[in-house]
């Protein structure tokens, strides 16, 4: 698919050009702007639980500078679980930054262990640690994920909407919308959250109705900033087109936590 890039600034344009589908080779930890760093996070609450993750720092990142950077927390799908951390860079932002060091976000991409699902507690602890260790713009923290990560995005984003400026769940769903519909306090917090959901109309794995139900529920409780893109010819893989769309990242950067 050829995307329209003329609306982007030059650096962002280069960063968001559609990537090819080859898997990245394991790369040494060369530092910011050159590759993603392989890191390990150990929860202080559960010392026995360790999670590996990829960390990308933009090319111009300088820890001594006063500039603070927007951050994307990316949740992969079930197929990328395990111990090979580079599987995480198969899709989405960690794939794009592997080839484009001028991507203008800090990107944190944890790997879920085999047989496990995303844990809100662990993800929040990892996010909080990253904010402590790096110069993050805490008003511009974004959450996105695909398939299993799409479910994780809905769950984490709707459970803790005050943590994020915007969320982008792709071919996901979940049960958190039931909690939202029954909680006035949660509804009020959600009204400041940007939401852009994506799904393929022909998805045989996660039915389109899963995303539709979430979007309809948000609109029902008065959440205004909700977008829903349905790709009419896409199956389960609606993420490639979504993550290769430069307008997605422009949309994210327009959102700040209020």
Question: Where on the chain are the PLM-derived regions?
Answer:
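Active-site machinery of serine-nucleophile hydrolases
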Residues: 71, 75-121
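Bacterial N-terminal signal peptides that target proteins for export
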Residues: 1-8
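C-terminal catalytic histidine-bearing segment of alpha/beta-hydrolase fold enzymes
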Residues: 198, 204-258
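Gly/Ser-rich "nucleophile elbow"/oxyanion-hole loop immediately N-terminal to the catalytic nucleophile
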Residues: 60-67, 115-148, 161
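Primarily recognizes the serine-hydrolase "nucleophile elbow" in alpha/beta-hydrolase
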Residues: 139-188
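A domain-start/cap signature at the N-terminus of enzymes
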Residues: 19-71, 156, 181, 212-216, ...
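Short, proline-enriched alpha-helix->beta-strand connector loops that line the catalytic pocket
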Residues: 189-195
């Amino acid at each position: 698919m050829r995307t329209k890039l003329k609306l982007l600034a030059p650096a962002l344009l280069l960063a968001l050009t559609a990537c090819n589908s080859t898997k990245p080779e394991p790369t040494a930890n060369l530092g910011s702007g050159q590759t993603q760093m392989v890191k390990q996070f150990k929860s202080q609450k559960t010392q026995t639980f360790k999670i590996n993750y990829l960390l990308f720092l933009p090319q111009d990142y300088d820890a001594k500078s006063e500039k603070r950077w927007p951050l994307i927390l990316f949740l992969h799908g079930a197929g990328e679980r395990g111990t090979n951390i580079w599987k995480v860079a198969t899709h989405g932002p960690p794939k794009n930054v592997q080839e484009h060091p001028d991507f203008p976000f800090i990107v944190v991409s944890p790997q879920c262990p085999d047989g496990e699902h995303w844990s809100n507690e662990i993800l929040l602890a990892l996010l909080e640690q990253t904010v402590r260790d790096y110069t993050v713009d805490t008003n511009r923290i974004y959450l996105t994920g695909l398939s299993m990560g799409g479910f994780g995005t809905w769950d984490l984003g709707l459970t803790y909407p005050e943590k994020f400026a915007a969320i982008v769940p792709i071919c996901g769903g979940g049960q958190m919308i039931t909690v939202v519909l029954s909680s006035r306090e949660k509804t009020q917090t959600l009204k400041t959250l940007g939401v852009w959901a994506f799904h393929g109309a022909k998805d045989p794995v996660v039915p389109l109705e899963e995303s539709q139900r979430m979007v309809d529920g948000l609109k029902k409780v008065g959440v205004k900033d909700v977008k829903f893109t349905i790709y009419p010819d896409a199956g389960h893989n609606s993420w490639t087109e979504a993550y290769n769309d430069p307008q997605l990242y422009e949309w994210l950067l327009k959102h700040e936590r209020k």
